[in-house]
Amino acid sequence: MKSSIILKELRAAIEEWARVHNIETSLIEIKPTGFGSSVHVLVVARKGFENWPRYERHDSLFDFVNAKVDRTGSDVFISRLSPMTEEEYEKYEGVEV
């Protein structure tokens, strides 16, 4: 199934992005939204986001994933992409991210 392959490639691209930027992740979560084949992507970093504004890390991850994962012909749609620190994650814990 093409969707499951795309999701594996998506996770691998996120892991590579973290390595390239020396980010120590504590959580990488790719979960279905329940609407079609759209997914929410959550990346929580233990280290590496300290001096990196949220919008810049979001744009960097978005650009990296789109360059690495060819979703042409796939029905997988990233409806939310959230790279955050552990502190930001704790602040929003319990809130749908």
Which stretches of residues belong to each language-model region?
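Short edge beta-strands and adjacent turn/loop segments
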Residues: 20-42
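Polar/charged, Gly/Pro-rich intrinsically disordered segments
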Residues: 55, 74-97
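Short secondary-structure junction motifs
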Residues: 23-27, 73-78
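Short, non-transmembrane amphipathic alpha-helical segments
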Residues: 14, 53-72
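Generic secondary-structure microfeatures
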Residues: 14, 18, 43-47, 65
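N-proximal, solvent-exposed amphipathic alpha-helical segments enriched in charged/polar residues
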Residues: 1-28
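Short, internal active-site loops enriched in acidic
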Residues: 35-36, 46-47, 83-89
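A short interface-forming secondary-structure element
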Residues: 41-58
